[in-house]
Design a protein with these regions (language model features):
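Residue-level recognition of beta-strand microenvironments
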Residues: 11, 47-48, 75, 92-95
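Conserved, short, structured surface segments that act as functional micro-motifs
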Residues: 60, 81-131
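Solvent-exposed coil/turn segments that connect beta secondary-structure elements
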Residues: 13, 33, 62-64, 110, ...
């Protein structure tokens, strides 16, 4: 199992003022400019400004899941680009509706909002542990 030594500053599922009534991803406490990379192979289905998410990238993974990387300061990929594990997607930031620098990471079963699953469990199932 690969371990990434990052602190989770906001866990998945916490009740709050988000549109879904709970936090639909995890927030990772990283500094502005931290490299953000794909966790596996897939295709970029969205890249650029995404409203409250600020600058964001969504990757449809080969397993059919959609991974959202949000509040980026910079985006380095374009819609339609093929990615693999380690492809540089952009840099973390504080764009959109954000209270401070972090990476918001979300896993969805469908492309649209409201089909989220626990991203920590998804990563663990794919050999990655946060913390």
């Amino acid at each position: 199992m690969t371990e990434f030594p990052v602190r989770i500053s906001q866990a998945y599922g916490v009740k709050g003022g988000w549109a879904a009534g709970y936090h639909t991803g995890v927030d990772l406490a990283v500094r502005v400019g931290t490299p953000v990379r794909s966790v596996g192979p897939g295709a970029v289905v969205a890249a650029g400004w995404a409203g409250d998410y600020g600058k964001a990238v969504t990757v449809r993974m080969e397993d059919g899941m959609y991974l959202l990387f949000a509040h980026l300061s910079e985006v380095y990929v374009r819609e339609g680009a093929a990615v693999r594990a380690g492809t540089w997607l952009g840099r973390s930031g504080n764009t959109g509706h954000s209270t401070g620098p972090h990476l918001h990471f979300e896993v969805r079963e469908q492309r649209g909002y409201g089909s989220d699953i626990d991203p920590v469990r998804y990563l663990a199932d794919h050999g990655v542990r946060l913390g």
